[in-house]
Amino acid sequence: MKTIYTLLIALIFTLNVNAQTETKVTSNGQNITVTIQNIKNDKGSVLLGLHTEDTFMKGPGIKNLKSKIENGQVTVTFTNVEAGNYAIMVMHDENDNNRMDFENGMPLESYGMSNNPMSYGPPQYQDAKFEVNDKDLSFNIRF
């Protein structure tokens, strides 16, 4: 029984040390500031998702933000973003239902992505991808 308690204490200590190490690493990440200026009205909110290739167009991002619109514009910041490749997707959720609305397969609400690609089909990760290194980044995304 003493052996089991000793192993449990050692395991908890190990997990605690790992958790502290991970927190320390993520607190050294970069900030990504996103500005959207051409929002057609102040109804609803803007939803923003920071995505990896694995999450892009498959659900929520690895970091997600929601912002109220003031005077047709929004500025938000993703904080503590670790180095790597990402893409940002944004949408104007006019009816605040937290999802994109469609009619006949076409989006009813405005949307945009990092790098502002002009595409005639579903958004592609490669078109919106950017790299985070050792500097903060800023993006102006258009709907």
Label for each model-derived stretch:
Residues K40, N80-E82, E94:
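Short loop/turn positions at the edges of beta-strands in beta-sheet-rich folds
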